[in-house]
Amino acid sequence: MLEAMAEPSPEDPPPTLKPETQPPEKRRRTIEDFNKFCSFVLAYAGYIPPSKEESDWPASGSSSPLRGESAADSDGWDSAPSDLRTIQTFVKKAKSSKRRAAQAGPTQPGPPRSTFPRLQAPDSATLLEKMKLKDSLFDIDGPKMASPLSPTSLTHASRPPAALTPVPLSQGDLSQPPRKKDRKNRKLGPGGATGFGVLRRPRPAPGDGEKRSRIKKSKKRKLKKAERGDRLPPPGPPRAPPSDTDSEEEEEEEEEEEEMAAMVGGEAPAPVLPTPEAPRPPATVHPEGAPPTDGESKEVGSTETSQDGDASSSEGEMRVMDEDIMVESGDDSWDLITCYCRKPFAGRPMIECSLCGTWIHLSCAKIKKTNVPDFFYCQKCKELRPEARRLGGPPKSGEP
């Protein structure tokens, strides 16, 4: 018996330790408490009407047991002092709501407004006014994202409804439109000014500069471009007028452009340009070309078709004419008339006569660009020197 009594003696200290580690006064939160808490928050925010259970839940008992329970509950969640403060604020909110429900008078809730202006449960009318104010602020601000979160809007939203209805609307209406105008001025003023500046000044300038540079290069390096395989230029008449108009525009431009115009003006003078115009084609029936019935009679009818053939030729055909085209003849050769068709060079491929050294268009000589002979004789040389057909004349190349 003594042994039996002695055995439980070492087991006695654990029961004494259990109440110390786990006090029986501790209360764990349940789902019902959480639901009550959520319903109270929703009722306070004004999303749902307050009920009797919600008003009676926080105010049951005196203030001291509530604080004790709040302290115990805070230990259940977190022992931080912030939880105690939040619970105490909710208790005060519940007390104020209970007083309003008990008194049910619109005049008496005035003191709580002065003491706790932000803890009041707003009515439906005040909620509607707040929503209208928010909508008006969003409509005025538009795409600006920082305006709803600005301190002014937050202060207006946090104010009580009595001061919120007259003041913020007038201030918002007076302060927001100037911002909108400022935005429009910012969008239209600097952006529009730059846009108009780009449209008026910079765009035409580079375009004209590019045209002038192209014309200048075409006049100086037209033959080199033909060697590289660029597209063939159309006949002389369409190409000459643009140079005239561009030269006139260059004279009206700034000093730098006038210098370029002076350089181009010396290359392509105005009186020489009328030569490739309409009166020139009738001159194809020239006394020089009339006697040879073999070549000239066909050349007069085939000038138009030959020009079309020149325009539709391929790039590979132009490479064959490297030796027969005047490459380093200078800019004056553009309007030079040497062929018996009385049309200028105009960048079209030509071939040099091996005897007299005159340059003649391949189209007038009826020579294909793919089949260029080593020795060529013009109609005059063939008529005056028939032995040129037999012997071939001196071995003179087509280089200039």
From Swiss-Prot:
One of its GO terms (molecular function) is zinc ion binding. Residues 1-30, 50-126, 139-318 are annotated as: Disordered. InterPro entries: Znf_FYVE_PHD, Znf_PHD, Znf_PHD-finger, Znf_RING/FYVE/PHD. Residues 245-260 have a biased composition (Acidic residues). Residues 232-241, 271-284 have a biased composition (Pro residues). It comes from the Eukaryota. It is found in: Nucleus; Cytoplasm. The modification N-acetylmethionine is found at residue 1. It holds the Pfam family PHD_2. Residues 92-101, 178-187, 213-225 have a biased composition (Basic residues). One of its GO terms (biological process) is negative regulation of autophagosome maturation. Residues 302-315 have a biased composition (Polar residues). One of its GO terms (cellular component) is cytosol. The modification Phosphoserine is found at residues 124, 147, 150, 312-314, 397. The modification Phosphothreonine is found at residue 165. Keywords: Acetylation, Autophagy, Cytoplasm, Metal-binding, Nucleus, Phosphoprotein, Ubl conjugation pathway, Zinc, Zinc-finger. A zinc finger (PHD-type) spans 336-384. Acts as a negative regulator of autophagy, through promoting ubiquitination and degradation of LRSAM1, an E3 ubiquitin ligase that promotes autophagy in response to starvation or infecting bacteria. Belongs to the PHF23 family. The PHD-type zinc-finger domain is required for interaction with LRSAM1 and negative regulation of autophagy. Interacts with LRSAM1. This is PHD finger protein 23. It comes from Bos taurus.
